[in-house]
Amino acid sequence: MGSLNNEVGSIKCEVGSLKSENSFTKLPSEESLASESKKVTPVSSDFELNCGSLAPTSLSFPAMKFEDDIEIQSPDNSIWESFFADHLEGDFMISSPVRNLPSPQPASSFSSSHNNGNNNNNNYNIYAHRQGIHGQDMMMCSPPRSPLGLYNHPSHKGKGLSPLQKVFNSPNNQFMQIESFNLPALESFLDDDYDKEEDLASSYSTLKVSGTGVAGSSSESFDALSVVPDDLLECLALPSSLSNTSGGFMESLLSDTSAVQVINPDDEIFRTGSIAPLSQQLHQERQQEKQQKQRPVTHARPQQQQIINHNVLVPLAAAPDQEQDSGLQLVHLLLACAEAVSKEDYMLARRYLHHLNRVVTPLGDSMQRVASCFTEALSARLAATLATKPSTSALKPFNPFPPNSLEILKIYQILYQACPYVKFAHFTANQAIFEAFEAEERVHIIDLDILQGYQWPAFMQALAARPGGAPFLRITGVGPSPEAVRETGRCLTELAHSLHVPFEFHPVGEQLEDLKPHMFNRRVGEALAVNSVNRLHRVPVNCIGNLLAMIRDQAPNIVTIVEQEASHNGPYFLGRFLEALHYYSAIFDSLDATFPADSSQRAKLEQYIFAPEIMNIVSCEGPERVVRHERLEKWRRLMEGKGFKGVALSANAVTQSKILLGLYSCDGYKLTEDDGCLLLGWQDRAILAASAWRC
C-alpha cells in the first residue's frame, strides 16, 4: 500500500553568554580524540540487562562490529568525521543500520543548491530553499519552513500517495476545520444487515469518494452501491506480502553483538531464551517473506469464501488500486465513526465499529494496522461511555511501555536502533548543551525524564575528549520511580568513572508537576542546562506554567526541548482524532518502510509504544488523558510567555542530523528548519520538533 505520510519544543540570566551561530563549539579533532582515548580506561564490553529494575545494570554496550572500518567523510567537517567515526562503535552513538555504508556524498550535497561555495567554515545555507512544508497540516501548520539539503530533494520521494494522503492533500480541505466538518451519512449501507451475521459479507457496500476529499462540503456524499461481495472482498483483503522499499536495510541493521533476542511467535514476548541479534531475526523474517513471495497464489475465490464463512480476513493478493480503495474506505469509516461519537450518536457509532471490526487487522499493511489501533480505541471510548456506571478509573492507567523492565529495554532498543527518531532527539539536544557548556569547568544537567539514561553516554564521551580535560559533570535525573532513577544513576556513574569524567548523580523520584526548587540542589558556579525529551506534553495544563517559571528562576544557560510535532490537545474530540490519525499513519508508514513485512519487532513497537498512545488520545478524557502533544508554535508561545528566548540550533546540529539520516537507507525521512528549530519528519509530515531556549 502506498505511503500514509500526509502531514499526519536554555537559559541563563546574566550568568554567561551563548555562542553565536558562527562561533559554535566544535568537537575535538580526530588526532586529539585518539590521543585522549589512550588515557581513558575502556568501557566494559558487557551489557547486562536487569530484570528487576527500569534501567539496565550497565550502560556500556558491546561495540558495534562492522565488516569494514567505516568513516563518515565530510570534507568541510573534519570535527564530525572524528566524532562519528569514534562513536559508530557504540550502541548509544549513531549506530548505523547500514553495514556497508556507501561512499560519502560531496560536501555540496549536504547544503542547499544556493550554497555560497565556502565549505571550510561550516556555513550551511539552510535558508536558501525556504518554503512551506509540502502540503498543509490539517490543524494550521507552522509558518513556512525550509527543507534542508539532500534529504528533501525531489528525487527522494519515498512511496506514493496513500489513501490518507489523498484525503488530507485534497485541493478542497476545508473539512479540516472542525467547525465545518460534516461527513455524509452512511446509513444506507448499514441498514438491514447490522444484526445479521450470515448476510454481512454480501450486504457490505463499497464507498466511493468524491473528487476532492472526504467531505469538502455538505453536498459531497458517498455513493452507496448495492451488493458487490467479490469486489469488496478483493479490495479489503490483505496482500500476501507487502512491498518493501528498504532494500537491503534490515539484513545489516545491527551488529552481531546486539542484545535483542530471538522471539519465537509461540513463546511469550521477550522470552529470555536463545540469544540472537536483531539483524539475524530480521534477516530470517526477510527470508521467510521471500519464500512466501515465490509460492504461487492459488484458489483466491475459496479463500474469499473462507473469509465469509469464518469471519476472518486472511492475506490475499491485491492490486495496488484495490489496496488504495480499501484504504480509502477504512479512512472514511474511521472518520464517520469518530463523527458519530463526537455527536453522541452512539447507535450509529456502534454500527460503524461493527463493520470496522470486520475489515481491520493488526497484521496487514500500515493502513490496516493503524486502522486497527484506532478502531480498538474508539471501541474503548464507546464502551466507557455506554457503561451502566461510567468510571474513568476503570480505564487502565496510561503506560507507554509494558511493565516488565526487560521488555522495556528490548522494545526501546529496537526503536532506538532501527529508527532515527530517538537519536535525532538526543543528539540535537546534546549538541546544543555541549555548545552552551563551552569553557565551563562545572556543569549541571537537569534531565526531566531520565529513563534509562540513553542520552548521556555520548555526551560524556564528548566531554571526555574536550581539550583540557572533562569538566565536573553533575546530572539530576527526574523520573516517577525513585528505584529506577537510582539504578540509572549507578550505571551512569560507572560509565563516567571509566571515562575519567568527574561525575555526580542526583536522583529525584517525583512527577514533574510535584517538583520543588530545592530538589534541583542548585550550586553556585555551575553552568546549568535543563533537558526535556518528549516529556513536557504529559504535564497537566494547570501545572506547566508553574514548572516553566520555576525552571526559568534557576537561571539555566540552555533549555532543550524535543516534542512530538502534533496537536493532540485540542478541545474537540473530532479534531484530536483527525490529527492523531494523520500523525500515527505517518509513523506506521515509516515503520513499514523500515521493517520487513510481518516483522515481529515492528509489531512490538506498534503494540507497546504507539498503540497505547493512540488509545489514550482517543478513548480518554479529563485527567486520564495524559498524551497531550502540542505543535512547535504552541510551545514557542508558551516559552516566550514565560520569559524565554529562542536559541537557533547551530550549523553543526544540522550537519549532525543530516549525517544521522544518511545512515538510514529509507529515503522518506525529512529534515526541516523552522525559525532556528529543527523538525524531523516522514515524507511531508513532521514527527519531532527540537528547540533550544535561554532567558
From Swiss-Prot:
Residues 328-393 are annotated as: Leucine repeat I (LRI). InterPro entries: TF_GRAS. It is found in: Nucleus; Cytoplasm. Residues 528-616 are annotated as: PFYRE. A motif (LxCxE motif) lies at residues 335-339. PFTA repeats lie at residues 105-139. Residues 283-292 have a biased composition (Basic and acidic residues). Residues 412-477 are annotated as: VHIID. Induction: Accumulates after inoculation with Rhizophagus irregularis. Its main location: nucleus. Coiled coil: none annotated. Disruption phenotype: Ineffective symbiosis with arbuscular mycorrhiza (AM) fungi (e.g. Rhizophagus irregularis, Simiglomus hoi and Acaulospora scrobiculata), with rare colonizations characterized by malformed arbuscules. Reduced AM fungi-mediated induction of AM-related genes involved at later stages of symbiosis (e.g. VAPYRIN, PT4, PT5, STR, STR2, RAM2, SBT and BCP). Residues 321-694 form the GRAS domain. Residues 487-518 are annotated as: Leucine repeat II (LRII). The keyword Cytoplasm applies. Residues 619-694 are annotated as: SAW. One of its GO terms (biological process) is response to symbiotic fungus. It comes from the Eukaryota. Residues 281-304 are annotated as: Disordered. One of its GO terms (cellular component) is nucleus. Keywords: Cytoplasm, Nucleus, Transcription, Transcription regulation. Forms homodimer in nucleus and cytoplasm. Interacts with NSP2, RAD1 and TF80. Belongs to the GRAS family. This is GRAS family protein RAM1.
